[in-house]
Every structure is written in C-alpha cells, then in structure tokens.
Amino acid sequence: MRYLTSPSHDIRTNLAIETYLMEHADLSEPILYFYINSPCIIVGRYQNVLAEINQAYVDQQKIILTRRTSGGGAVFDDLGNVSFSFITKDDGDGFGNFKRFTAPVLKALHAMGATGAEMSGRNDLLIDGKKFSGNAMHVENGRLFSHGTLMYDVDQSQIAKALTVPADKMASKGIKSVRSRVTNLRPYLAPEYQHLTIEAFRDTLAREILGVADLASAKTYPLDDAAQAGVAALNQKYFKNWDWIYGQSPAFELKHRRHFTAGTVEFRLNIAAGRIADLTVYGDFFGSQPVQPVLDHLKGVKYTCAAVTTALADLDLSQYFGQIEREALIDLIVEQGDAQK
C-alpha cells in the first residue's frame, strides 16, 4: 500500500486530489490518502444543499462548501478532523463493503487505546454509542474509493449551527442527512495520544495502518507537475464550481413569511438546479404597483443573496412593497435573518 498526505487544508483541493487519484493513479497497489480540512461542509452527491445547511451562518462564518462525488450525508469538518481515503481497484467485493475498509482504521484506533470503537449500521463508526466517523464510497471504471472522517477534536458547537435548517420551511425531494449524536475520539484514546496535534494524530494512524515504525520507510505516491495540473483542472470543473455544488440540487419548495410594521409578506419559491424557477408573493402590504415585475426579475436567478440583490438592483421596491426596506425583503427571500450569531 502506498501513502499520500495532502499539504492543503482546502477541502476542494483535497477532493480534487482524491478524484485525480481515482481517475489516473497507478493502482497496482492501493493508495492510503489522508487530508485535513479547514472549516467546511461537504454534502453528498445526491443531496439538496439548501436542505442540509444554514446558508446564512455558513456565509457569515466563511465556511467552505462543496459537494463530493460519493453519496451519503452532509458532514462538517474542521482542523480537528482527519479524513482518510482508500483508493483501489474494484475487485467486485469492495463497493458497499464498509467493514472491509474501516477495519484497518478500527484496528489502529484500538491500538491507540480507543478499544470501544466499532462499526455500527451501514457506514458509521461509533464509540460509547456516539458517532465519530461517517464513511462513503464511489465506484467508477473499475476503480473505487472509500473515504471517511475521524473526529479527533472537532468544534462540535459548529456542527449544529452550520448544518441546521428550520424543518418547516422546506419540502425537498433530496436525500436528507440523518443527524446523529457525535463525539470526539480524543478522550477515548490512551493518555499519550490525547494531546497530539492533528498532524501527529494523522501520522500515528498512518504508521499503525501501514505497519511501519517511521513514515519515512513507507512507500509514497508523489504528485508530479502533470498531476498537480490535473488536480487544478478538476478543482475548477467540480469542487469550486457553483453549478456542481448548487446546480446538482433537486427541485424543492420554500415558504418564507415575515411580519413587518408595514405589513406581512410571504414568498413561496420553487428552486431547481440552484436557481429560482418560479415564485409567488402573498401578504397584506400596500404597494402602488403590481408585484409582477419583481417576480419576473427573480425568475432564473441563482438562489443566493448576492444574485438576488443584483437582480433587484434596478427596481424601486417601495413601489411594490410600500415602506418595507429593500434589505429586509432580500433577507426574507433568501432567509439571511436565520443566521445564528
């Protein structure tokens, strides 16, 4: 087995490296790939982004958002998490066999003192009944990867804030994540492993899995200039691409209602491929003009605060909504007001 760690903390680059290895690497031997991410959310291949995240909070906290090529649910990562990926040929007994690919990880954790770590359900690793690792797979052209998270010292307060969306505001056909009780591994490890840097935790895991006393003796899989160029191209094509991240979301409906001093306004929006496909407005507000021009300006627009703001820039919204402020109306459309401070 060969070994690779990413020097980047950007989830988009790290997923692009994984995709490049999946598509182009010499897999005569499996590759064990580790990466550590700055705060980010990774949604599953078939999920509705806006059904999984608190967009306003994510924007305010500058949390990176992307979509991976594998299925499964949304996860939050930060610099207290280590992600691992086994990239190998598909021998016909790999896809869906999470036990096979998590067994080396569990063995390593047991050796580090987390003897209660175990697999549970389809693709989770638990300790003391709490989840510390979610796993997913992707198979294509006779190759597959199985990747997962390992929460060593993640800021758990961020998870609920970043992944929470008010349930009564959305009716979606996407695959919603199942929220689980989560925990960090650190307090369950032997004392000598409870105060490691995240890099030292990663390297200790790697040595245990690879069966070497020193990673300098492990076989590596370096990325040459051509590989780096390929990674950059994949990053732009997929993981930094708005259409890949948001445009893959299934159609869904939103209902946003708020009472202002000048009246109540309710927007109902149909979102498809990350854009406003249709919308209507209801309320007891007073405007001097019919609201249809507002609706026309918004149809086909990306469902983001910036895009909605730009689309309405040349309209005097007071003609349509009376004394309700422009910023408040835009906040209502995209629900920016729901951000948790």
Residue ranges and their predicted role:
Residues M1-G96:
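N-terminal lobe of the biotin/lipoate ligase/transferase fold
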Residues I36-P39, E118-G129:
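Short, glycine/charge-rich beta-strand/loop segments that flank catalytic centers
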Residues R68-S83, L125-I127, K131, A136-F145:
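FAD-binding core of FAD-dependent oxidoreductases
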Residues N81-R122:
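Contiguous, small/hydrophobic- and glycine-enriched helical/loop subdomains that border
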Residues T88-G94, P187-Q194, Y282-F285:
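A generic structural motif
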Residues V105, M112-A114, S133, N141-Y246, ...:
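Long, positively charged amphipathic alpha-helical accessory segments at protein N-termini or as interdomain linkers
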Residues A136-M137, L150, R258, V265-G283:
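Short beta-strand elements
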Residues Q228-A272:
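Structured beta-strand/loop patches that form or line metal/cofactor-binding pockets in enzymes
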